[in-house]
């Protein structure tokens, strides 16, 4: 269950299937996968979950905080394996990271914790910048509100004005970039969000077209022509979700499976895009990069 359409989910679905195969499960052979997407519309979640409960699914794999909240509210018996950013204990998903209790466990990323670091990268790339745009998904309020506050605190400490812009569907993207131009924001930082992550290619293309230096979470953004990405690798998170889903299908209880945490943060830089934007990437920043696209 995800806010991302199936045709845009390929890069994440493949590692999920790889994770399932660790326990011997292969789609179409001995396991049926019923993929459900809300296409970024959280109003659809109750109906989606009601149908899954009617079908008596064995496990629910859920990506994104809003999806997990809805799934948790819908059932206390069907195991739920989540992939989320932020603190799953703080959000009430589990009682304890090591002994989750209840019917939820999964994978936690450092999505929220590393977000303010992206503003520091903006400062390194553009030392004279005074104004930055922040793109958030308002339909994901659970993590967005907390992360936005952290970003505003970081912006103040850097002497930078932060303009919060919102997009919960593709039709919002053009107005967002029009606002960036009107506000004269010198860069764009995209918050960690499953829907926004799934639109990496569109956002990278728009950032290039409007000559906006942009920083994203995942490597897909840089591969699509974006300038910089800084965050954990979501594909690895999905592989772990697949492994846990397979273990639960084999009989393990989510209450006994510790929440796994992705802690390795990757920095990717697209030098070709930097050149197109007329930017000179500082050598110390290049030296810290895990991958440089030339």
PLM feature spans:
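Short hydrophobic alpha-helices and adjacent helix-cap/hinge residues
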Residues: 1-294
């Amino acid at each position: 269950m995800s806010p991302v359409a199936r045709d845009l989910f390929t890069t994440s679905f493949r590692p999920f299937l790889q994770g399932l195969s660790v326990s011997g499960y292969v789609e179409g052979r001995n396991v049926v996968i019923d993929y459900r997407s809300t296409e970024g519309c959280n109003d659809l979640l109750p109906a989606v979950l009601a149908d899954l409960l009617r079908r008596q699914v064995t496990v629910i794999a859920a990506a994104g905080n809003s999806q997990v909240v809805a799934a948790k509210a819908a059932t206390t018996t069907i195991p739920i394996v989540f992939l989320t950013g932020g603190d799953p204990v703080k959000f009430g998903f589990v009682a304890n990271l090591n002994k989750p209790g209840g019917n939820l466990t999964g994978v936690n990323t450092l999505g929220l914790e590393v977000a303010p670091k992206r503003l520091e990268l903006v400062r390194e790339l553009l030392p004279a910048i005074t104004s930055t745009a922040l793109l958030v998904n308002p339909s994901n309020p659970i993590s967005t509100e907390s992360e936005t506050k952290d970003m505003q605190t970081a912006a103040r400490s850097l002497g930078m004005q932060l303009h919060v812009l919102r997009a919960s569907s593709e039709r919002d993207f053009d107005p967002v970039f029009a606002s960036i131009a009107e506000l004269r924001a010198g860069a764009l930082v995209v918050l960690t969000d499953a829907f926004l992550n799934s639109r990496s290619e569109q956002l990278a293309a728009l950032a290039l077209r409007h000559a906006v230096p942009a920083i994203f979470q995942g490597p897909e953004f840089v591969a699509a022509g974006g300038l910089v990405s800084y965050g954990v690798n979501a594909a690895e998170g999905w592989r772990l979700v697949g492994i846990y889903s397979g273990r639960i299908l084999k009989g393990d209880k989510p209450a006994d499976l510790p929440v796994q945490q992705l802690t390795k943060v990757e920095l990717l830089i697209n030098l070709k895009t930097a050149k197109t934007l007329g930017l000179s990437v500082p050598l110390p920043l290049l030296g810290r990069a895990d991958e440089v696209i030339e």
